[in-house]
């Protein structure tokens, strides 16, 4: 399986380049777990300025309510109470696995800004080896370079059409939160997915996203002064 590298100044630019590459050069592979096929490749997309505008892609499933909720799931743990409850028992949330390690990476980088040890491990072998839905997110590494916090994320599997943008946007929100604690700026964001894929049911959606991107018609939103206000308005409902 090929692994591609794309980049952009902003998150939407890099993400859109990744979608185009998957659509054009992804390999069709069977997915017996869901009795379907996927279009797949390995993918790394590099965002030079994680907070650059326009910061919102229109090429994702959901809207400002869903995005606000997901950011709060990752950064604030609003759904941690679901762990161990319900018919479909949640074994974990990303926040539950991340929260105990935030203090470590902040302390590590405070003591040694050049450290290469500030890593948050999300995979838990004691659980994930026996889980039908092991964590897609494997680890997050943060580094300070040029007085800015860079973040590097590794995912074993990432649904390009239904999950990737919301994942990356929320992880950048976490990056911003950690940078604020350290008193540094926000730098680059690098997102690697060993399996960057789109399920067969979404191939039409992927093609529509790519057509919109290539025609350069209404594919982004500004965040500051527009989408941030829409998202903030959803907080009471979340």
Give short role names for the model-derived ranges.
Residues 1-238:
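Terminal, non-catalytic protein-protein interaction segments that mediate quaternary/complex assembly
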